[in-house]
Amino acid sequence: NNPLIFEIDLGFAVDLGVVTIERARVRLRFDPLGPPELTAFAAGIDIPGALRGRGYLEMNESEIKGQIDLTIVPVQVRIAAGVGVANINENGRKATGVIVSLEVEFPVAIPLGNSGLGIYGFLGLFAMHYSRKEPPPSAMAPALAWLKDIAQGNPTDIAAWSPKIDTWAFGVGAVLGTMGSSVIFNLKGVVMLELPGPRLLLMMRANLLAVLPKLKGTAEGTFLAVIDLDMGRGTLTIGLSVEFGIQPLLEIHIPVEAFFNFHDSKDWHLYLGRFIEQIHAKILEVFDGSGYLMLSGKGFAAGDLADGLPVPVNGFAISTGLHVSFVWGSKSVGLYAEVAAGVDAVLGFDPFRLTGVLYLRGTLHVFIIDLSAWAKLTVDIGEKPDGSKVASISGQICGRVKFLFFSIE
């Protein structure tokens, strides 16, 4: 009863003059045998001095959707629109899903008083029997993970939505930017209402570009932010992701998450980085540092903390960590020295327990010879969940000489 289908997705650039074909997806049915089917198509258009843009169309047995992005060259007005229609059958229930998105950008901003900012465009979205695609499990807040990984920073991208009965969404937003400034800053923000729930979301993506003549480089930053108020569940989630760099000097990544449950006063947390996704900075390919600070009203479970720290930790708890490393030389050549140090700790109050792990590691690599030494210190003071007391300090010091074919430790 299983059909035999062969599908090929081609990406190319066939220039036909005004029109450029960019993509085509063809499906062939062998059992039962059927004619070829075009299931996806993308093309661009460029009429000099008049119009340029691109669009795509996808279709299958139950859904057809596409987007188009055009710029009217004489007036420099950009218009982007997307439409999707789906026939949905879920557990015997049938419905027709519709999603529509629209975005308009102007060449000249509408000034916002004396703020130095202006409105460069507007955007909107309507979705009936459509919902946001579920992002894969990650360390980020779900709505922020969707905005970053699925929607690629654009909430009105209909490719980030999928058909689902009894879900609705309404969104309006604007595009803001600087006016007459050497620092280029633009922000795309959307206020979205989702049903059932109701659920109110504020999603923002901001880009920053500043030219630094003295450093002969540029400072670039991308900021993603989500405020998710789920009135049905009684929760508030705030997520922030910052990527900032000054090439070739500095790279910084900062994740932040806050969560509050209005039905349970102990169910809250504030994460300035997490052990599994830390605040990270790199300077000149020489210094590498990361760290985190986690506060939780309900403690921590397995997977939340560094290796060597006890879990679970109940009640209000704090966990923090800092890790740094320096590299001199070239790892690609095989001649370098590296020093690394770090500490991870957790403090719980129900019952009281303080545990910390400190390590120091050094390596000298000279082509085929590798000299390494490391030390580790663990401190554990307080009371275990079973009521037994603990007060211990333990350490370990090791060294190793590694040659091309053997090592001594």
Predicted features and spans:
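Extended assembly/interaction regions that build large supramolecular complexes
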Residues: N1-E409
